[in-house]
C-alpha cells in the first residue's frame, strides 16, 4: 500500500512513495545508495548527497523525460517534488485569467541555477517556454549542458547571463518581451557566515562528514546575499514596477512566514494591483510563494489572449 505525502499539489507526480525498483532500473547508480529504515522498509540514504543526486537523475528521467541530467560538485541538488509543487501552483495562478491551464506560457526563471530544475519540469508538464537568468557563468554552462543533452529542450529553454551587479530584471527582460510569469527561489541567508552556519547545522543533523557536506551544498549566489531573502525580494518588487506592462505575474518563494509583512508593505508602496500568497507543503516542510501583478482582471485576460 502506498502512503501519500501530505500537502503536495493534486497534479504533483510524487504523492506516492518512491518506486525504488523502477527508479533503480532507470538509473542503476541509485542501487548502491539504498538502505533499510528501522521499520525494515527500503529507502534512499538521504544523508548522502551523492544518493540524492542519483535519485534526482532517476526522477527526472522517469517522470520528466530528462534522460541526461548532471550538476557539478558544490551546486545545490534540489528536491524534485517541492520544485514541481511551485510549478503546479503557478499553473493554477495563470489559469485564473481564463479558467483553463495556460499551455503556451512564457516564464522567466530568476536564478535558473546549474540544475535548471524549474524549466525542466515546466516544459514537460505544461509545454511552457522558459528564459532562465543566472549570474554565475559556471551555473549557466551546467544548465546549458543539460539543455543541449536532451532533445527538444533547446527550442523551449534559453539562458541569459545577468551581467549587471545587483540587478534582477534589468538587463534580462528585453524591451519588447512579454512574460506570463516570473519565478524565483531567492538566496536565503544574509551573509557567508550565516550560510556556513546553516550548512553546518544541516551537516550535523544529517550526520555528514565535512567532505560530504561540500558536495551539492550550494554556491554563494544560491545561498546568501546582502540583506538576505527579504532584501532580495524587496529589490525584485521595486524593479518589477518598471516591467508592469510586460509581465502578468511576478512571483517568488518566501522561506519564512515572518518575512511576509515587510514585503507586503513594499508591494503597497509600489502600487501592486493584486497580491496573492500560495501556501505549499511537502511532508513536514511548509513553504509558500507570493505573487503580485500590476494588471487588473480585464488587463490580465487581454494579456493572456494576446498574439504570441
From Swiss-Prot:
GO CC terms on record?
Answer: cytoplasm
InterPro entries, sorted: METTL16/RlmF, rRNA_lsu_MeTfrase_F, SAM-dependent_MTases_sf
Q: Give the UniProt keywords, A-Z.
A: Cytoplasm, Methyltransferase, rRNA processing, S-adenosyl-L-methionine, Transferase
Catalysed reaction(s) here are: adenosine(1618) in 23S rRNA + S-adenosyl-L-methionine = N(6)-methyladenosine(1618) in 23S rRNA + S-adenosyl-L-homocysteine + H(+)
Q: Name one GO molecular function term.
A: 23S rRNA (adenine(1618)-N(6))-methyltransferase activity
Q: What class of enzyme is it?
A: transferase
Instruction: List the EC numbers from the record.
Output: 2.1.1.181
Task: Tell where it localizes.
Answer: Cytoplasm
Q: Is Transferase a UniProt keyword of this protein?
A: yes
The record's section on Pfam families has: Methyltransf_10
Report if keyword S-adenosyl-L-methionine is assigned: yes
Its primary localisation, in coarse terms, equals cytoplasm
Biological process, per Gene Ontology: rRNA base methylation
What domain of life is recorded for the organism?
Answer: Bacteria
Q: What does this protein do?
A: Specifically methylates the adenine in position 1618 of 23S rRNA.
Similarity-based family:
Belongs to the methyltransferase superfamily. METTL16/RlmF family.
Protein's name according to its UniProt entry: Ribosomal RNA large subunit methyltransferase F
UniProt source species: Escherichia coli (strain SMS-3-5 / SECEC)
**Taxonomically, what lineage is the organism?**
Bacteria, Pseudomonadati, Pseudomonadota, Gammaproteobacteria, Enterobacterales
